[in-house]
């Protein structure tokens, strides 16, 4: 027979690792082709000129130039100029 009472198990103690989403290059910053500009879930930012959209909605530079963020009709666009 146990000399001490058994303790209850905790239902806490879990946490998921962060996904490191967000803007990686700010407006006006120079980027080279292939650099990631935004990591996102869904199209929070839409693709503009000279940028590509990955299958996980990552926006990346297709050519070298300066990053430009602009809003048109309530949508945020990312372009390279």
UniProtKB/Swiss-Prot annotation:
Entry GO terms, CC: cytosolic large ribosomal subunit
Compositional bias per record (Polar residues), positions renumbered to this chain: 1-11
UniProt family annotation: Belongs to the bacterial ribosomal protein bL27 family.
Highest taxon of the lineage: Bacteria
GO molecular function terms listed in the Swiss-Prot or TrEMBL record: structural constituent of ribosome
Protein name from the UniProt record: Large ribosomal subunit protein bL27
GTP-binding found in the keyword field: no
InterPro entries listed in its UniProt record: Ribosomal_bL27, Ribosomal_bL27_CS
């Amino acid at each position: 027979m146990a000399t001490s009472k058994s303790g209850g198990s905790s239902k806490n103690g879990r946490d998921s690792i962060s996904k490191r989403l967000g803007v990686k290059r700010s407006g006006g910053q120079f980027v080279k082709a292939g650099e990631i500009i935004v990591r996102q879930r869904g199209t929070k930012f839409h693709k503009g000129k000279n940028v590509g959209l990955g299958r996980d909605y990552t926006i990346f530079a297709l050519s070298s130039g300066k990053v430009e963020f602009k809003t048109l009709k309530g949508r945020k666009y990312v372009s390279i100029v």
